[in-house]
Curated annotation (Swiss-Prot):
Keywords noted in UniProt: Collagen, Extracellular matrix, Glycoprotein, Secreted, Signal
Signal peptide: 1-32
GO molecular-function term, one example from the UniProt record: frizzled binding
Function: May act as a negative regulator of collagen matrix deposition.
Coiled coil: none
GO CC annotation terms, alphabetical: collagen trimer; extracellular matrix; extracellular space; sarcoplasm
Disulfide bonds: none
The protein, known as: Collagen triple helix repeat-containing protein 1
Domain Collagen-like as annotated: residue spans: 59-92
Localisation: Secreted, Extracellular space, Extracellular matrix
Region entry Disordered, spans: 64-87
The keyword Glycoprotein is annotated on this UniProt entry: yes
Amino acid sequence: MHPQGRAAPPQLLLGLFLVLLLLLQLSAPISASENPKVKQKALIRQREVVDLYNGMCLQGPAGVPGRDGSPGANGIPGTPGIPGRDGFKGEKGECLRESFEESWTPNYKQCSWSSLNYGIDLGKIAECTFTKMRSNSALRVLFSGSLRLKCRNACCQRWYFTFNGAECSGPLPIEAIIYLDQGSPELNSTINIHRTSSVEGLCEGIGAGLVDVAIWVGTCSDYPKGDASTGWNSVSRIIIEELPK
């Protein structure tokens, strides 16, 4: 089965029909018996047809599709849309607190003694006054020096810090102890040893301003005192430092 061709356009068919009609009129013989007026009208009609359709071009086949044109200019902005619906409620977040504080400036002090050689068993040994800059800070204190305790029977001695006359309560006292037992009968319990030791700790809850920091010697609870000595033949020092919390 042969494929059918594409149908001719109506304009092409009409033009072919008119040309065919013109050719038939031109080729038809004119009878001698015809009236001259009729012959003249026929010639006039033929000229009119020739004038009307002279130069008429038949429609050719369709051309190749043209290329895409250049993109058009952007259109005007559209009108805003209607507001959307509210979203779902989010989860509860964490609360963050930011503290904007001035930069921390180191604040410390040292008091030292070349040879305290303090032989008391009860009382204040040395004191150092410090200026505390902030109320919400802590004080770090250190005493370094030689300590000694001797006795013939069991004894105990305690060295501790005070702040403006009171021991630290934030959180607990700052102290060090030496306990000496009488030992066995064959040992000499009166041996005299001086050893460099330290008493150190942090204390919180002290207000800003002048603070009298002192090192003391006293007794241990439920034990008798002995023969104490502090700072013999060596340098002793108290170091105080203010620290941020």
